Design a protein with these regions (language model features):
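Short glycine-/polar-rich loops that comprise or flank the Walker A/P-loop
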Residues: 45-48, 143-146, 152-153, 174-179, ...
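P-loop NTPase Walker
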Residues: 1-91, 328-331
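Conserved coupling/interface region of RecA-like P-loop/ASCE motor cores
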Residues: 155-159, 166-210
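A short acidic, amphipathic alpha-helical/loop segment
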Residues: 35, 65, 133-141, 234, ...
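Conserved helicase NTPase motor core
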Residues: 2-12, 16-20, 74, 83, ...
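Core RecA-like ATPase module of SF1/SF2 helicases and allied nucleic-acid translocases
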Residues: 26, 56, 190, 240-343, ...
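Inter-lobe coupling/hinge region of RecA-like P-loop helicase motors
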Residues: 1-12, 16-23, 177-184, 205-252, ...
């Protein structure tokens, strides 16, 4: 897929301090990858470019996309970059335990590295999920001379892990920072996108979804009381009409809900799979996604993924973070979104015509 004019402006941006406000399904990963390629092909030394991703799988995907253009560029999580700095300083990284959190790594970097060479070009993905400690590490320790931060605070779903989306929101408002929009939504049908907007726009102007409909599909949204048997029947009906099990996501808020739905579908002889994103490499993720099974996932595990038909189990909008999590869930669906709520009484409606 070629870049649109908004993506091209970001890829070739000349300003030193840039924040990209990227909505769901707007081509953020492609834009970030092509920005790295642009810098590399422009002649920026590879060791002067640092790309911080949120997960190892995202780093692996970017390296695969870049091919030879990415060779010699640091691409990895903030944990792995802290490890890299320690290793480069001569610190024995074998002393670092795999389970150490970033607080411990940050302390070790402070203690063992007297001076960190400022990064010439820093690119940061998922900036909305950055916490205060990571922010200090980036701006007070590695001190990038040029930075481009990609963010969508509407998808900030890690406050429980210390993320502060206000950091990137406030940075983008500074006079010296240039902001670029990335708003063309190429995934969601029009009705699905409008449903997602209604969820998130309640949070005020900083969270307003300015996404522009670009998928060319209308999409369908149905809000129903939760009935597991009805969901199973709906999946089976779609299979009878030559759709695939792999066309379906069942998205849950908690692991216990995942287990409940997974074993229920198994007992209904519906092939299904579940996994945690952190446990998979990018290649393993692609393999699992391509298998002809219904994917039963937490909403957090589904972030960054998409499917034709999505069922969301009993999600409520009772605070800011839950609205962001709900927004992520809704924007996974391309053609059909079934939004369920806890059942008060049995209610069966044939909502989908599979002809």
């Amino acid at each position: 897929m070629s870049l649109n004019k908004y993506q091209e402006k970001i890829v070739k941006a000349q300003e030193p301090y840039v924040v990209v406000n990227a909505s769901a399904a707007a081509g953020k990963t492609q834009t970030l990858t092509e920005r790295v390629r642009f810098l590399s092909q422009k002649g920026v030394p590879k060791d002067c470019i640092v790309v911080i991703t949120f997960t190892n799988a995202a780093a692996e995907e970017m390296m695969e996309r870049l091919g030879d253009d990415g060779y010699g560029i640091f691409i990895g999580t903030i944990h792995s970059y802290a490890n890299y700095l320690l290793l480069s300083s001569g610190y024995d990284t074998s002393k670092i335990l795999n389970e150490e959190n970033f607080d411990d790594l940050f302390t070790k970097v402070q203690k063992h590295i007297d001076c960190i060479k400022p990064v010439e070009y820093l690119l940061l993905d998922e900036a909305q999920d950055t916490g205060e400690l990571e922010w200090t590490f980036i701006f007070d320790m590695i001190k990038p001379k040029n930075y481009m931060l990609f963010s969508d605070h509407k998808q900030s779903i890690y406050r429980w892990k210390g993320a502060h989306p206000e950091l990137i929101i406030n940075l983008a408002k500074k006079e010296e920072v240039t902001t670029y929009p990335l708003f063309h939504n190429y995934r969601n049908g029009r009705n699905i996108l409008n449903f997602a907007k209604r969820i998130i726009d309640k949070l005020g102007p900083d969270y307003k979804d300015n996404s522009l409909f670009a998928s060319g599909k209308e999409g369908k949204v149905f809000e129903l009381e939760l009935d597991k048997n009805y969901i199973a029947n709906m999946i089976n009906n779609s299979i009878e009409k030559n759709h695939n099990y792999s066309d379906w996501f069942i998205l849950c808020r908690t692991n216990s809900q995942v287990n409940e739905m997974y074993y229920f579908l198994k007992n209904q002889n519906i092939p299904c799979d579940t996994f945690k994103r952190a446990d998979l490499s990018n290649k393993e993720l692609i393999k699992r996604m391509n298998s002809n099974t219904v994917k039963v996932l937490t909403i957090h595990a589904a972030k960054g993924l998409e499917n034709k038909y999505v069922v969301v189990i009993g999600q409520k909008f009772y605070n800011e973070e839950e609205r962001c999590i709900s927004y992520v869930a809704a924007t996974r669906a391309k053609e059909l979104l079934i939004w369920t709520k806890p059942a008060k009484k049995k209610k069966k409606i044939d909502v989908v015509n599979w002809e």
